[in-house]
Amino acid sequence: MKTLATLIITFCLALTPVGIIAGQRDADPEGDGFEAKLKFETREIKLGDIHGSDADRSFSFIGVNAGNAPLVLTYVHPSCNCVRLQYPREPIAPGDTLRIQGRLNSHGLSYGPFRRDIIVRSNAAEPKIRLLLTGTVSPDSID
């Protein structure tokens, strides 16, 4: 029994480095020093107080390819259908800026604070970035 326990522990310890190595993500798989780096001016836009009658609220996230390889946005998706997005589909050259523009339609939102995520996936060193829209929907005042 003691031999079996020793054998199991030895086997687990032998496989630990394999699991660690397999779990590492190499941002530069070719090892050639070229990689895209996506940097945003801000990752959160505070839309403030939105009245129920406000149909749409526009916003823009501005980023730059701070790497030395072309940047390709492979997936840009909001957390709800109340957000419509426009973003560049073509590769962004190193040093160039990009703009993710959108409109938030507040009609489907409940009154009170809200938080909506926008997931951006790309070939950058940080492959997944979460952008955030926050604000508060309030009822129209009765005058």
Predicted regions and their residues:
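Beta-sheet-dominated interaction scaffolds and their linkers
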Residues: 21-66, 134-143
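Bacterial N-terminal signal peptides
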Residues: 8-16
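Buried hydrophobic-core signal for structured, non-transmembrane domains
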Residues: 59-65, 102, 116-121, 133
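Terminal connector regions
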Residues: 110-139
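Surface-exposed binding patches on compact interaction domains or structured appendages
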Residues: 68-97
